[in-house]
Structure formats: structure tokens, C-alpha cells
Amino acid sequence: MVTQDIPAVDIGFTHEDFAALLDQYDYHFNPGDTVVGTVFNLEPRGALIDIGAKTAAFLPVQEMSINRVESPEEVLQPSEMREFFILSDENEDGQLTLSIRRIEYMRAWERVRQLQTEDATVRSEVFATNRGGALVRIEGLRGFIPGSHISTRKAKEDLVGEELPLKFLEVDEDRNRLVLSHRRALVERKMNRLEVGEVVVGAVRGIKPYGAFIDIGGVSGLLHISEISHDHIETPHSVFNVNDEVKVMIIDLDAERGRISLSTKQLEPEPGDMVRNPEVVYEKAEEMAAQYREKLKQQAEGLVVTE
């Protein structure tokens, strides 16, 4: 048997060539990109994610959700496939850092902008209060309710854990400002059952130099000093005391600003009755309100010329 030496063939393909080939077909991932990846390992500090890069990307536990996460198992499962946001460039080991929180954050702002456009009412639980107001979460975002927009007789600190209906006042992603109003939500709900020219019974809850604030079924309306009486009044204190029960007429409903304007002046049978004898005004309230509504109707029909 004859054996023949076969010369070794130089295939000319080195490790360097293989690395160059990988680089040639490697996708260049950039911070800000959204990619699809697969979870292949969960660790106490985060998770390793296969996104098709040469090195597994890392998802820190603090980037797993817009909400607080204690461990990766709360959010992810091995082999789960989902979207990830590339948070930073490769480190010295060639590893990218990913985020789910950033995706949820962007989508949350998109959602609250949509809700604001729809003038939607949302509900959220107060999780903390401070000197300025109360804090809530909307779609995972932290929102603030100024104290002036909290319509409740409870102390602010007693609101923690309570769910409130809310309207949007300001949605500004660039400044990270999400401001809401409890008062507007209540006023809107109340406004749907109120009409201009309607007489309502309320209680005086506050008195300022410019007028009195009247509680009418859980929402506050303003009885401006100019709408108390036809007679000149130096101060609302000369007519009202806090906790007085009063009859007032609604003269304006401003849903956009969440304001209810009230009047006793329009209910006076004779100018100055509210100063001299309020009981006469309250007794004749429905009769005077009917005249006021008729006047509004005639004005709308162009039958009355206003001065």
C-alpha cells in the first residue's frame, strides 16, 4: 500500500480575520436606541440580556421599572423577550447598559399628555404630603397637587392613603412637572348638576377682604364682595360670619378654571336688603332667581338691552 503525503492547506483564516468578520456584520448599538432582547440570566443586581451584541448587555435592577423594584424576579422571567432602551455606550468590557424604566417613562408621559388633551378625570392615591400639597402617582409618574387645589376639610397629612379624583393642570415632560387639581375634579362633577340662575344652600367656610367662600355640597364657590349687595359694603365680615348658613344664586360656572361664582345681590327684593335683613332675601330667593333667569333668557333672545 502506497501512502501519499498530502500537503497541509493554508486556509488563510485567522482569529484576527474572524474578529474582523464579526465587526463587519456587527450591528452598532447607540444610546437612545430601542432594541428587542431576551433575558437569559437574572442576578441580584440586575439581569443579562441578549440583544445580538458581541457581549451580553446589562439591565440594572433600578432600571427595570418606573416603579420601585427590589429584585429582578418581580419584573422579569428567564427567556422572556421584550423591548429595552439602550441607556449608555459600551463600557471597557464592551457591555451596554439597558433600561426598561426609560421606555415606561416615555410612554407614561405620552399617556398623560393624551389624558390631558381629553380633559380626563383620573383617580390616584395620595402617598405623601408636604407643606405645599400632596403627592400622587399617575401612570407611574410622580404628580403634585398644590394645597390650593385640594378641596377637603381634612388636614393634608390625613390624606395619605386616600384615593382622590383629579384633573390635569400642567403636563410638562421637559421640566418633569405633573401638576393636578382635586378641586377642579370635584367642581366639574358638581357643575354637571348645577345651572346658572339656580339657588343653592351653602355654608360660609372662609371670609377674605374680597369676598366669602361658600361650601355648596362639598365644593367651594366665591361670593365676591361686589355680589353681596347693591349697597356698598366695606368688608364681607359686616354681613357674614364663618359657618353661617346662606342661600346664594349661581351666576357663573367656569369649568376650565374650576370656579363657581355666586351672588346674593341678584336675590335682593330691594337694594340693600342683604345688609339690612338677609332673611327677607332668603325668603324671596326662588322668586328673585326666577326673575333673573327670565332676564337672562330675554337677553339671549335679544329682547333686553343691557346697560
Swiss-Prot record:
Coiled coil: none
UniProt GO cellular component terms: ribonucleoprotein complex; ribosome
Domain S1 motif residue range list: 32-101, 119-183, 197-265
InterPro entries recorded: NA-bd_OB-fold, Ribos_protein_bS1-like, Ribosomal_protein_S1-like, S1_domain
Transmembrane intervals: none
Domain of life: Bacteria
One of the Pfam families matching this protein, by short name: S1
Gene Ontology BP terms: translation
GO MF annotations, alphabetized: mRNA binding; structural constituent of ribosome
Keywords: Repeat, Ribonucleoprotein, Ribosomal protein, RNA-binding
Main function: Binds mRNA.
Similarity remark: Belongs to the bacterial ribosomal protein bS1 family.
Protein name per UniProt: Small ribosomal subunit protein bS1
Organism: Synechococcus sp. (strain ATCC 27144 / PCC 6301 / SAUG 1402/1)
Name of the coding gene: rpsA
